[in-house]
């Protein structure tokens, strides 16, 4: 199960976060800061999986953004990496070469995409084509 999703830039600013497990605001900020310190300091030759407290962080870097997912230690890490990649592919197809500013200024659309891909901390829709069709439908609503 996915506990939370964080999208952070290299400077540590959280550009987007989605929490599937309830945390206090102070704890959310602390987790975001700790995770950024961990993933930002790792070399590219290391694996994209990190043990973190009682969970596991699976992350992937795209350009200047870190996409981090906190999962149970029993979850399949490669599946999580592919879920992150699917999410980024959908963002890229939807926005056309997505960048950090797209996430900042169109955050409500990014949250809609997250809600189409993930439901209650689980991958809901594995088809990029279906997700993009749903987003097109939402865009055409009056």
UniProtKB/Swiss-Prot annotation:
It comes from the Eukaryota. GO terms for molecular function: clathrin adaptor activity. Its main location: membrane. InterPro entries: AP_complex_ssu, AP_mu_sigma_su, APS2, Longin-like_dom_sf. One of its GO terms (cellular component) is clathrin coat of coated pit. Keywords: Cell membrane, Coated pit, Endocytosis, Membrane, Protein transport, Transport. Gene3D superfamilies: 3.30.450.60. Pfam families: Clat_adaptor_s. GO terms for biological process: clathrin-dependent endocytosis; protein transport; vesicle-mediated transport. It is a peripheral membrane protein. It is found in: Cell membrane; Membrane, Coated pit. Adaptor protein complex 2 (AP-2) is a heterotetramer composed of two large adaptins (alpha-type and beta-type subunits), a medium adaptin (mu-type subunit AP50) and a small adaptin (sigma-type subunit AP17). Component of the adaptor complexes which link clathrin to receptors in coated vesicles. Clathrin-associated protein complexes are believed to interact with the cytoplasmic tails of membrane proteins, leading to their selection and concentration. Belongs to the adaptor complexes small subunit family. This is AP-2 complex subunit sigma.
């Amino acid at each position: 199960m996915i506990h939370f999703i964080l999208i952070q830039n290299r400077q540590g600013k959280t550009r987007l976060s989605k929490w599937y497990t309830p945390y206090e605001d102070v704890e959310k900020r602390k987790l975001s800061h700790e995770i950024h310190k961990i993933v930002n300091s790792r070399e590219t030759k290391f694996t994209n999986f990190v043990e973190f407290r009682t969970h596991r962080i699976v992350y992937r870097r795209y350009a200047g953004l870190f996409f981090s997912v906190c999962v149970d230690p029993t979850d399949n890490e490669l599946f999580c990496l592919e879920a992150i990649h699917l999410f980024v592919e959908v963002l890229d197809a939807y926005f056309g070469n997505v960048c950090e500013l797209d996430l900042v200024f169109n955050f409500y659309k990014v949250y809609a995409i997250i809600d189409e891909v993930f439901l209650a901390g689980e991958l809901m829709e594995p088809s990029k084509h279906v997700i993009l069709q749903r987003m097109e439908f939402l865009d055409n609503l009056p």
